[in-house]
Protein backbone atom coordinates (compact mmCIF):
# COMPACT_ATOMS: atom_id res chain seq x y z
CA UNK A 1 0.00 0.00 0.00
CA UNK A 2 1.35 3.44 -0.95
CA UNK A 3 1.04 5.93 1.91
CA UNK A 4 -0.13 9.49 1.23
CA UNK A 5 2.65 12.04 1.68
CA UNK A 6 2.89 15.49 3.25
CA UNK A 7 5.55 17.76 1.74
CA UNK A 8 7.19 20.18 4.18
CA UNK A 9 8.01 23.31 2.16
CA UNK A 10 9.42 26.72 3.03
CA UNK A 11 12.34 29.12 2.94
CA UNK A 12 15.73 28.13 4.39
CA UNK A 13 16.03 28.06 8.16
CA UNK A 14 12.36 28.42 9.11
CA UNK A 15 12.47 25.18 11.12
CA UNK A 16 11.21 22.64 8.59
CA UNK A 17 13.45 19.78 9.75
CA UNK A 18 12.66 20.50 13.41
CA UNK A 19 8.96 20.29 12.56
CA UNK A 20 9.54 17.03 10.67
CA UNK A 21 11.20 15.51 13.74
CA UNK A 22 8.32 16.72 15.91
CA UNK A 23 5.61 15.33 13.60
CA UNK A 24 7.41 12.00 13.19
CA UNK A 25 8.54 11.81 16.82
CA UNK A 26 12.10 11.18 15.70
CA UNK A 27 15.44 12.90 15.26
CA UNK A 28 16.18 11.59 11.78
CA UNK A 29 16.10 14.99 10.06
CA UNK A 30 19.34 16.94 10.54
CA UNK A 31 18.75 20.22 12.38
CA UNK A 32 21.37 22.98 12.39
CA UNK A 33 21.03 26.75 12.68
CA UNK A 34 22.29 27.45 9.18
CA UNK A 35 20.42 27.71 5.85
CA UNK A 36 20.88 24.93 3.30
CA UNK A 37 21.54 21.98 5.63
CA UNK A 38 18.75 19.98 3.97
CA UNK A 39 19.30 19.57 0.22
CA UNK A 40 17.70 16.33 -0.94
CA UNK A 41 14.15 15.38 -0.02
CA UNK A 42 13.97 12.76 2.73
CA UNK A 43 11.08 10.53 3.77
CA UNK A 44 9.85 9.43 7.19
CA UNK A 45 6.73 7.50 8.17
CA UNK A 46 4.38 8.98 10.73
CA UNK A 47 0.96 8.21 12.23
CA UNK A 48 -1.72 10.21 13.99
CA UNK A 49 -5.27 9.36 14.94
CA UNK A 50 -4.89 5.81 13.63
CA UNK A 51 -3.80 6.95 10.15
CA UNK A 52 -0.39 6.44 8.62
CA UNK A 53 1.32 8.80 6.18
CA UNK A 54 4.73 9.91 4.96
CA UNK A 55 6.38 13.21 5.83
CA UNK A 56 8.76 14.56 3.19
CA UNK A 57 11.41 17.01 4.36
CA UNK A 58 12.75 19.33 1.66
CA UNK A 59 15.50 21.89 1.31
CA UNK A 60 15.00 25.62 1.69
CA UNK A 61 13.16 26.96 -1.37
CA UNK A 62 14.56 30.14 -2.96
CA UNK A 63 13.34 31.43 -6.33
CA UNK A 64 15.44 34.58 -6.61
CA UNK A 65 18.92 32.98 -6.44
CA UNK A 66 20.59 30.33 -8.63
CA UNK A 67 23.88 30.03 -6.74
CA UNK A 68 25.39 26.81 -5.36
CA UNK A 69 22.80 24.02 -4.93
CA UNK A 70 19.67 26.18 -5.02
CA UNK A 71 18.44 25.12 -8.51
CA UNK A 72 18.88 21.44 -7.57
CA UNK A 73 17.06 22.02 -4.28
CA UNK A 74 14.19 23.65 -6.20
CA UNK A 75 13.93 20.56 -8.38
CA UNK A 76 13.73 18.32 -5.30
CA UNK A 77 11.02 20.51 -3.76
CA UNK A 78 9.00 20.45 -6.99
CA UNK A 79 9.23 16.65 -7.08
CA UNK A 80 8.08 16.42 -3.46
CA UNK A 81 5.06 18.61 -4.19
CA UNK A 82 4.12 16.57 -7.25
CA UNK A 83 3.73 13.35 -5.25
CA UNK A 84 2.24 14.97 -2.13
CA UNK A 85 -1.36 14.87 -0.96
CA UNK A 86 -0.80 17.98 1.18
CA UNK A 87 1.80 20.75 1.22
CA UNK A 88 2.70 22.05 4.68
CA UNK A 89 4.07 25.55 4.05
CA UNK A 90 6.30 26.48 7.01
CA UNK A 91 6.99 30.17 7.69
CA UNK A 92 8.87 32.03 10.45
CA UNK A 93 6.52 33.86 12.81
CA UNK A 94 9.34 35.97 14.25
CA UNK A 95 10.35 37.34 10.85
CA UNK A 96 6.85 37.91 9.54
CA UNK A 97 5.95 37.74 5.86
CA UNK A 98 9.01 38.04 3.60
CA UNK A 99 9.36 38.43 -0.17
CA UNK A 100 10.55 34.82 -0.24
CA UNK A 101 7.34 33.69 1.46
CA UNK A 102 5.27 35.64 -1.06
CA UNK A 103 7.10 33.99 -3.99
CA UNK A 104 6.52 30.51 -2.58
CA UNK A 105 2.87 31.31 -1.81
CA UNK A 106 2.30 32.45 -5.41
CA UNK A 107 3.79 29.17 -6.69
CA UNK A 108 1.69 27.08 -4.29
CA UNK A 109 -1.51 28.90 -5.30
CA UNK A 110 -0.85 27.80 -8.89
CA UNK A 111 -0.40 24.15 -7.90
CA UNK A 112 -3.18 21.60 -7.45
CA UNK A 113 -1.93 20.52 -4.03
CA UNK A 114 -3.89 21.37 -0.87
CA UNK A 115 -1.75 23.76 1.20
CA UNK A 116 -1.74 24.38 4.96
CA UNK A 117 0.28 27.30 6.38
CA UNK A 118 2.19 26.49 9.59
CA UNK A 119 3.57 29.58 11.34
CA UNK A 120 6.58 28.25 13.25
CA UNK A 121 8.51 29.71 16.19
CA UNK A 122 5.33 30.81 17.98
CA UNK A 123 6.57 29.79 21.41
CA UNK A 124 4.01 31.98 23.20
CA UNK A 125 0.37 30.94 22.72
CA UNK A 126 -1.04 34.45 23.14
CA UNK A 127 1.55 36.07 20.87
CA UNK A 128 1.37 33.19 18.41
CA UNK A 129 -2.20 33.98 17.35
CA UNK A 130 -1.22 37.59 16.71
CA UNK A 131 1.95 36.60 14.83
CA UNK A 132 0.07 34.09 12.68
CA UNK A 133 -2.62 36.58 11.65
CA UNK A 134 -0.11 38.46 9.49
CA UNK A 135 0.18 35.42 7.20
CA UNK A 136 -3.42 35.66 5.97
CA UNK A 137 -1.98 37.91 3.26
CA UNK A 138 -0.33 34.85 1.64
CA UNK A 139 -3.75 33.94 0.23
CA UNK A 140 -3.56 30.29 1.30
CA UNK A 141 -6.24 30.22 3.95
CA UNK A 142 -5.99 30.24 7.73
CA UNK A 143 -2.43 30.20 9.14
CA UNK A 144 -1.84 27.93 12.17
CA UNK A 145 0.66 28.93 14.90
CA UNK A 146 3.01 26.16 16.08
CA UNK A 147 6.26 25.71 17.92
CA UNK A 148 8.28 22.88 16.40
CA UNK A 149 10.88 23.07 19.14
CA UNK A 150 8.37 22.88 22.04
CA UNK A 151 5.57 21.01 20.30
CA UNK A 152 2.77 23.47 21.03
CA UNK A 153 0.11 23.57 18.32
CA UNK A 154 1.46 20.52 16.49
CA UNK A 155 -1.34 18.24 17.70
CA UNK A 156 -3.99 20.58 16.28
CA UNK A 157 -1.96 20.82 13.09
CA UNK A 158 -1.88 17.03 12.75
CA UNK A 159 -5.65 16.85 13.33
CA UNK A 160 -6.10 19.21 10.41
CA UNK A 161 -3.69 17.24 8.23
CA UNK A 162 -5.53 13.97 8.94
CA UNK A 163 -8.86 15.56 8.00
CA UNK A 164 -7.42 16.68 4.65
CA UNK A 165 -5.80 13.35 3.70
CA UNK A 166 -7.57 11.42 0.92
CA UNK A 167 -10.02 8.93 2.42
CA UNK A 168 -9.55 6.33 -0.34
CA UNK A 169 -5.85 6.58 -1.00
CA UNK A 170 -5.32 2.81 -0.82
CA UNK A 171 -8.28 1.69 -2.97
CA UNK A 172 -6.32 1.73 -6.21
CA UNK A 173 -3.61 -0.53 -4.80
CA UNK A 174 -6.18 -3.17 -3.83
CA UNK A 175 -7.45 -3.53 -7.39
CA UNK A 176 -5.66 -5.91 -9.70
CA UNK A 177 -4.68 -3.74 -12.66
CA UNK A 178 -1.98 -3.85 -15.28
CA UNK A 179 -0.39 -0.40 -15.45
CA UNK A 180 0.84 0.49 -18.93
CA UNK A 181 2.59 3.81 -19.56
CA UNK A 182 2.81 5.31 -23.04
CA UNK A 183 6.26 6.94 -23.20
CA UNK A 184 7.94 9.00 -25.90
CA UNK A 185 9.19 12.32 -27.19
CA UNK A 186 6.73 15.15 -27.93
CA UNK A 187 4.59 14.71 -31.04
CA UNK A 188 5.33 11.04 -31.76
CA UNK A 189 1.62 10.23 -31.51
CA UNK A 190 1.16 9.13 -27.89
CA UNK A 191 -2.21 10.83 -27.46
CA UNK A 192 -3.41 9.56 -30.84
CA UNK A 193 -2.43 6.08 -29.70
CA UNK A 194 -4.38 6.48 -26.45
CA UNK A 195 -7.44 7.57 -28.43
CA UNK A 196 -7.07 4.60 -30.79
CA UNK A 197 -6.75 2.21 -27.83
CA UNK A 198 -9.81 3.63 -26.08
CA UNK A 199 -11.89 4.04 -29.22
CA UNK A 200 -12.69 7.64 -28.25
CA UNK A 201 -11.05 11.08 -28.07
CA UNK A 202 -9.58 10.67 -24.60
CA UNK A 203 -6.66 13.08 -25.13
CA UNK A 204 -6.19 16.31 -27.10
CA UNK A 205 -4.25 15.72 -30.30
CA UNK A 206 -2.53 18.40 -32.39
CA UNK A 207 0.61 18.99 -34.43
CA UNK A 208 1.92 21.34 -31.74
CA UNK A 209 4.68 19.71 -29.74
CA UNK A 210 3.87 19.46 -26.05
CA UNK A 211 0.06 19.47 -26.26
CA UNK A 212 -0.10 16.92 -23.44
CA UNK A 213 1.43 18.57 -20.37
CA UNK A 214 0.31 16.07 -17.75
CA UNK A 215 -0.15 12.32 -17.37
CA UNK A 216 -3.63 11.14 -18.36
CA UNK A 217 -4.88 7.97 -16.66
CA UNK A 218 -7.47 5.78 -18.39
CA UNK A 219 -9.03 2.53 -17.16
CA UNK A 220 -10.22 0.04 -19.78
CA UNK A 221 -11.05 -3.68 -19.84
CA UNK A 222 -9.27 -5.72 -22.54
CA UNK A 223 -8.96 -9.49 -22.87
CA UNK A 224 -10.39 -10.09 -19.37
CA UNK A 225 -7.80 -7.77 -17.83
CA UNK A 226 -8.24 -4.32 -16.31
CA UNK A 227 -5.65 -1.92 -17.75
CA UNK A 228 -4.61 1.42 -16.33
CA UNK A 229 -3.15 3.27 -19.32
CA UNK A 230 -1.10 6.40 -18.68
CA UNK A 231 -0.49 8.83 -21.53
CA UNK A 232 2.52 10.84 -20.40
CA UNK A 233 3.78 14.27 -21.38
CA UNK A 234 6.36 14.31 -24.15
CA UNK A 235 9.87 14.26 -22.72
CA UNK A 236 12.32 16.75 -24.19
CA UNK A 237 15.97 17.48 -23.50
CA UNK A 238 16.43 18.71 -19.94
CA UNK A 239 18.00 22.02 -21.03
CA UNK A 240 14.88 22.86 -23.05
CA UNK A 241 12.50 22.35 -20.13
CA UNK A 242 11.44 25.29 -17.95
CA UNK A 243 9.76 25.14 -14.57
CA UNK A 244 5.98 25.01 -14.80
CA UNK A 245 3.41 22.63 -16.23
CA UNK A 246 5.90 20.96 -18.57
CA UNK A 247 8.36 20.37 -15.73
CA UNK A 248 5.68 18.72 -13.60
CA UNK A 249 4.36 16.70 -16.54
CA UNK A 250 7.79 15.33 -17.39
CA UNK A 251 8.45 14.33 -13.79
CA UNK A 252 5.11 12.53 -13.70
CA UNK A 253 6.18 10.74 -16.89
CA UNK A 254 9.38 9.53 -15.25
CA UNK A 255 7.43 8.40 -12.20
CA UNK A 256 5.05 6.55 -14.51
CA UNK A 257 7.99 4.59 -15.92
CA UNK A 258 9.15 3.69 -12.44
CA UNK A 259 5.68 2.47 -11.34
CA UNK A 260 4.58 0.76 -14.56
CA UNK A 261 4.09 -2.94 -15.10
CA UNK A 262 4.95 -2.36 -18.76
CA UNK A 263 6.09 0.64 -20.81
CA UNK A 264 5.08 1.27 -24.41
CA UNK A 265 7.93 3.25 -25.96
CA UNK A 266 6.58 5.11 -28.99
CA UNK A 267 9.03 5.82 -31.83
CA UNK A 268 8.28 8.02 -34.84
CA UNK A 269 8.70 5.91 -38.01
CA UNK A 270 9.63 9.02 -40.02
CA UNK A 271 12.21 10.48 -37.61
CA UNK A 272 13.66 7.17 -36.45
CA UNK A 273 15.51 6.88 -33.15
CA UNK A 274 16.83 10.15 -31.71
CA UNK A 275 19.18 10.79 -28.77
CA UNK A 276 16.16 11.47 -26.58
CA UNK A 277 14.58 8.15 -27.58
CA UNK A 278 17.79 6.42 -26.52
CA UNK A 279 17.71 8.17 -23.14
CA UNK A 280 14.13 7.08 -22.58
CA UNK A 281 15.04 3.51 -23.53
CA UNK A 282 17.92 3.69 -21.07
CA UNK A 283 15.57 4.88 -18.32
CA UNK A 284 13.20 1.97 -18.95
CA UNK A 285 16.09 -0.51 -18.87
CA UNK A 286 17.61 1.13 -15.79
CA UNK A 287 14.32 0.84 -13.88
CA UNK A 288 13.93 -2.81 -14.92
CA UNK A 289 10.53 -2.32 -16.55
CA UNK A 290 8.90 -4.63 -19.10
CA UNK A 291 8.62 -2.93 -22.48
CA UNK A 292 7.04 -3.04 -25.93
CA UNK A 293 8.53 -0.82 -28.65
CA UNK A 294 5.80 0.68 -30.85
CA UNK A 295 6.83 2.29 -34.14
CA UNK A 296 4.04 4.74 -34.97
CA UNK A 297 3.10 6.49 -38.25
CA UNK A 298 3.97 3.37 -40.23
CA UNK A 299 1.25 4.34 -42.71
CA UNK A 300 3.38 7.33 -43.80
CA UNK A 301 6.40 5.22 -44.78
CA UNK A 302 6.89 4.20 -48.41
CA UNK A 303 7.70 0.52 -48.30
CA UNK A 304 8.31 -2.71 -50.16
CA UNK A 305 8.53 -6.32 -48.99
CA UNK A 306 11.86 -5.80 -47.20
CA UNK A 307 11.30 -2.33 -45.69
CA UNK A 308 10.03 -3.55 -42.33
CA UNK A 309 13.08 -5.80 -41.82
CA UNK A 310 15.53 -3.05 -42.80
CA UNK A 311 13.85 -0.48 -40.55
CA UNK A 312 13.67 -2.86 -37.58
CA UNK A 313 17.36 -3.70 -37.92
CA UNK A 314 18.27 0.00 -37.95
CA UNK A 315 16.03 0.85 -35.00
CA UNK A 316 17.27 -2.05 -32.89
CA UNK A 317 20.89 -1.07 -33.49
CA UNK A 318 20.14 2.23 -31.74
CA UNK A 319 17.85 0.80 -29.06
CA UNK A 320 20.26 -1.92 -27.97
CA UNK A 321 19.28 -1.23 -24.33
CA UNK A 322 15.98 -2.94 -25.13
CA UNK A 323 17.18 -5.79 -27.34
CA UNK A 324 14.75 -8.09 -25.50
CA UNK A 325 11.66 -5.98 -26.33
CA UNK A 326 9.05 -6.89 -28.91
CA UNK A 327 8.84 -4.30 -31.72
CA UNK A 328 5.59 -3.72 -33.60
CA UNK A 329 4.77 -1.29 -36.41
CA UNK A 330 1.45 0.54 -36.12
CA UNK A 331 -0.59 3.50 -37.23
CA UNK A 332 -2.49 5.20 -34.42
CA UNK A 333 -4.29 7.26 -37.08
CA UNK A 334 -5.72 4.28 -39.01
CA UNK A 335 -5.74 1.81 -36.10
CA UNK A 336 -3.40 -0.61 -37.91
CA UNK A 337 -2.11 -3.28 -35.46
CA UNK A 338 -3.09 -1.18 -32.41
CA UNK A 339 -4.96 -4.14 -30.89
CA UNK A 340 -1.72 -6.18 -31.02
CA UNK A 341 -0.20 -3.92 -28.37
CA UNK A 342 -2.28 -5.54 -25.61
CA UNK A 343 -1.23 -9.05 -26.57
CA UNK A 344 2.47 -8.21 -26.51
CA UNK A 345 2.19 -6.00 -23.41
CA UNK A 346 0.41 -8.74 -21.45
CA UNK A 347 3.01 -11.28 -22.52
CA UNK A 348 5.79 -8.92 -21.39
CA UNK A 349 4.11 -8.46 -17.99
CA UNK A 350 3.70 -12.23 -17.61
CA UNK A 351 7.37 -12.80 -18.42
CA UNK A 352 8.37 -9.97 -16.07
CA UNK A 353 6.53 -11.67 -13.20
CA UNK A 354 7.70 -15.21 -13.99
CA UNK A 355 9.59 -17.36 -11.49
CA UNK A 356 11.70 -20.39 -12.39
CA UNK A 357 12.69 -23.17 -9.99
CA UNK A 358 16.35 -23.60 -9.10
CA UNK A 359 16.44 -27.07 -10.65
CA UNK A 360 15.25 -25.74 -14.02
CA UNK A 361 17.72 -22.84 -13.88
CA UNK A 362 20.58 -25.27 -13.31
CA UNK A 363 19.46 -27.54 -16.13
CA UNK A 364 19.73 -24.57 -18.48
CA UNK A 365 23.12 -23.56 -17.08
CA UNK A 366 24.45 -27.11 -17.31
CA UNK A 367 23.45 -27.33 -20.97
CA UNK A 368 25.01 -23.91 -21.65
CA UNK A 369 28.29 -25.06 -20.06
CA UNK A 370 28.21 -28.16 -22.23
CA UNK A 371 28.06 -26.08 -25.37
CA UNK A 372 30.63 -23.52 -24.27
CA UNK A 373 32.96 -23.75 -21.26
CA UNK A 374 33.90 -20.65 -19.24
CA UNK A 375 37.05 -18.90 -20.47
CA UNK A 376 40.54 -19.65 -19.17
CA UNK A 377 42.84 -16.77 -18.28
CA UNK A 378 46.50 -16.57 -19.33
CA UNK A 379 47.41 -17.56 -15.80
CA UNK A 380 45.72 -20.90 -16.49
CA UNK A 381 42.87 -20.24 -14.06
CA UNK A 382 39.47 -21.14 -15.48
CA UNK A 383 36.07 -19.88 -14.45
CA UNK A 384 33.77 -22.31 -12.63
CA UNK A 385 30.00 -21.83 -12.57
CA UNK A 386 28.75 -23.78 -9.56
CA UNK A 387 25.01 -23.15 -9.63
CA UNK A 388 22.37 -20.48 -10.14
CA UNK A 389 19.02 -19.53 -8.63
CA UNK A 390 16.33 -16.93 -9.26
CA UNK A 391 16.20 -14.56 -6.30
CA UNK A 392 13.37 -12.24 -7.39
CA UNK A 393 11.06 -11.20 -10.21
CA UNK A 394 9.88 -7.87 -11.62
CA UNK A 395 12.48 -7.85 -13.08
CA UNK A 396 13.61 -11.51 -13.08
CA UNK A 397 16.92 -11.59 -11.21
CA UNK A 398 19.29 -14.55 -11.01
CA UNK A 399 22.31 -15.04 -8.77
CA UNK A 400 25.05 -17.17 -10.34
CA UNK A 401 27.62 -18.54 -7.91
CA UNK A 402 31.11 -18.86 -9.39
CA UNK A 403 34.67 -19.31 -8.19
CA UNK A 404 35.69 -15.78 -9.25
CA UNK A 405 33.43 -13.24 -11.05
CA UNK A 406 36.50 -11.61 -12.62
CA UNK A 407 37.08 -14.73 -14.70
CA UNK A 408 33.79 -14.20 -16.56
CA UNK A 409 34.09 -11.44 -19.15
CA UNK A 410 31.27 -9.55 -20.84
CA UNK A 411 31.17 -11.92 -23.84
CA UNK A 412 30.58 -15.02 -21.72
CA UNK A 413 28.08 -13.22 -19.51
CA UNK A 414 26.07 -12.26 -22.59
CA UNK A 415 26.26 -15.88 -23.76
CA UNK A 416 24.75 -17.12 -20.49
CA UNK A 417 21.97 -14.50 -20.66
CA UNK A 418 21.22 -15.53 -24.24
CA UNK A 419 20.98 -19.20 -23.23
CA UNK A 420 18.62 -18.35 -20.37
CA UNK A 421 16.40 -16.40 -22.76
CA UNK A 422 16.47 -19.12 -25.43
CA UNK A 423 15.38 -21.77 -22.96
CA UNK A 424 13.16 -19.88 -20.54
CA UNK A 425 11.72 -16.99 -22.55
CA UNK A 426 11.50 -13.57 -20.87
CA UNK A 427 10.61 -11.78 -24.12
CA UNK A 428 9.63 -8.22 -23.32
CA UNK A 429 11.33 -8.30 -19.93
CA UNK A 430 14.84 -7.42 -18.81
CA UNK A 431 16.71 -10.00 -16.75
CA UNK A 432 19.48 -9.31 -14.28
CA UNK A 433 22.37 -11.69 -13.66
CA UNK A 434 24.30 -11.23 -10.42
CA UNK A 435 27.69 -12.98 -10.47
CA UNK A 436 28.81 -13.88 -6.96
CA UNK A 437 32.11 -15.38 -5.86
CA UNK A 438 31.84 -18.38 -3.53
CA UNK A 439 34.50 -20.15 -1.48
CA UNK A 440 34.54 -23.94 -1.97
CA UNK A 441 34.05 -24.61 1.74
CA UNK A 442 31.01 -22.30 2.00
CA UNK A 443 29.67 -23.66 -1.28
CA UNK A 444 29.60 -27.27 -0.06
CA UNK A 445 27.80 -26.31 3.16
CA UNK A 446 25.18 -24.25 1.36
CA UNK A 447 24.44 -26.68 -1.47
CA UNK A 448 24.11 -29.66 0.87
CA UNK A 449 21.74 -27.71 3.10
CA UNK A 450 19.54 -26.68 0.13
CA UNK A 451 19.90 -30.01 -1.68
CA UNK A 452 21.42 -28.36 -4.76
CA UNK A 453 23.75 -30.22 -7.09
CA UNK A 454 26.91 -28.37 -8.10
CA UNK A 455 27.00 -28.04 -11.88
CA UNK A 456 30.72 -27.52 -12.34
CA UNK A 457 33.22 -28.70 -9.73
CA UNK A 458 36.81 -27.53 -9.25
Swiss-Prot record:
Gene Ontology molecular function, alphabetical: GTP binding; ribosome binding
Gene3D superfamilies: 3.30.300.20, P-loop containing nucleotide triphosphate hydrolases
UniProt entry keywords in alphabetical sequence: GTP-binding, Nucleotide-binding, Repeat, Ribosome biogenesis
Binding positions (GTP 1): 10-17, 57-61, 120-123
Residues annotated to bind GTP 2: 184-191, 231-235, 296-299
Biological processes annotated in GO: ribosome biogenesis
EngA-type G domain boundaries: 4-169, 178-353
UniProt key word GTP-binding: yes
InterPro entries membership: G_ENGA, GTP-bd, GTPase_Der, KH_dom-like, KH_dom-like_a/b, P-loop_NTPase, Small_GTP-bd
UniProt cross-references to CDD domains, sorted A to Z: EngA1, EngA2
NCBIfam families from the UniProt entry: GTPase_EngA, small_GTP
Function: GTPase that plays an essential role in the late steps of ribosome biogenesis.
Subunit structure: Associates with the 50S ribosomal subunit.
Protein family per UniProt: Belongs to the TRAFAC class TrmE-Era-EngA-EngB-Septin-like GTPase superfamily. EngA (Der) GTPase family.
Protein name, per record: GTPase Der
Amino acid sequence: MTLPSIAIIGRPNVGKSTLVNRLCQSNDAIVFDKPGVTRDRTYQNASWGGKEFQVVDTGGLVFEDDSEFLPEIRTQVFLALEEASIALFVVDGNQGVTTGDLSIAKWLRNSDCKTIVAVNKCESLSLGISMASEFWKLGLGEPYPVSAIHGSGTGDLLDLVIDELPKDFDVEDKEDKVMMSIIGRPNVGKSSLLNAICGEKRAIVSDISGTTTDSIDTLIKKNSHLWKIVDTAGIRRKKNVKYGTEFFGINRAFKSIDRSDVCVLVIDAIDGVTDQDQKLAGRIEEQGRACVIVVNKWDLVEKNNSTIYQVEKELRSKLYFLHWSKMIFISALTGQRVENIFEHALNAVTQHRMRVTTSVVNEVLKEALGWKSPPTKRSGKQGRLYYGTQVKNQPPTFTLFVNDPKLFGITYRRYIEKQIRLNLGFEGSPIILLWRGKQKRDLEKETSKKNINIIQKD
